[in-house]
Amino acid sequence: VTPLDYEFLRKLLKERSGLDLSSDKQYLVESRLIPLARRAGLPGIAELVEKIKGGSDALISEVVEAMTTNETFFFRDKIPFDHLRQTVLPELLTARAGRRALRIWSAASATGQEPYSIAMCLKEMGAALAGWRVEIIATDLSLGVLEKARAGIFSQFEVQRGLPIQMLVKYFTQAGELWQLNADIRAMVQHQQLNLLQDFSHLGTFDVIFCRNVLIYFDGETKAGIFARLAKVLEPDGVLALGAAESVVGISDAFKADPERRGLYRPTPAKTARAGGGASSALKVVASAR
């Protein structure tokens, strides 16, 4: 990829997705966009850029999708899910006993392993959640990964990464070399396309937000804006889970670290003021039909 084409793609990706490519990521652009160019019948990246400049919106969407699809696997990093099971959910069951409703958001959910891991955690609670209204909203910028997530079909390699064998046996059905999540787990998650750069107040408010391993790709200003918007849709006693390499320190004062649980953050009280009701008054968001 030439320096001029690389700079064009950097600006395009920043504007469309917030992805902040450093000056030394040519290898990443080449590894992801050369196959895309060839599928489009083009010799290489130079021709791909030329076609984009000619006004191909469909191709722009494919470029953004190819560059923003990130690695994911079941129960990634394990610790946030341990916190969810052992302390976060039990505390929320007490705090929400009056309205018996929970809303959880998995942002940048990719092919679905994270929201489905959350769903299995909730399913494991059994009778403790009987009679509760539980919503898990999974969002991603990419339509392609959302389609895969909805199907809930995973390869042998995918289910071997992080998924305990007892959960594989309990919640999946094997079909040849593939594994499909059982319908009851799939039904717990609602999938929707969303760009984190845009307003997301229409989602309503949440008790737990997982926004993990995506903010590392944004610059400081973009991160600060996302944190400010996240604070407005998280309940005052809610929990934000970030990735192991992510932090709010030096970026935003909208959240403070939970001193006892690594990777979890609480809204700063002064930053949680917002218009409208809480999660109990939020409209239910249904999976987008396309």
Tell where the protein language model's regions lie, with residue ranges.
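Residue-level signal for inorganic ion chemistry
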Residues: 84, 209, 234
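Conserved AdoMet
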Residues: 1-105
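Extended basic-aromatic, gly/pro-enriched interface segments that bind polyanionic ligands
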Residues: 107, 127-210, 214-225, 247-249
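Conserved SAM-binding loop of SAM-dependent methyltransferases across substrates and taxa
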Residues: 111-129
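A short glycine-rich, Lys/Arg-flanked "PGG" loop and its adjoining helix->strand segment in the class I
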Residues: 224-236
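Core SAM-dependent methyltransferase catalytic element
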Residues: 251-290
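Conserved beta-strand signature within the Rossmann-like core of class I S-adenosyl-L-methionine
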Residues: 236-244
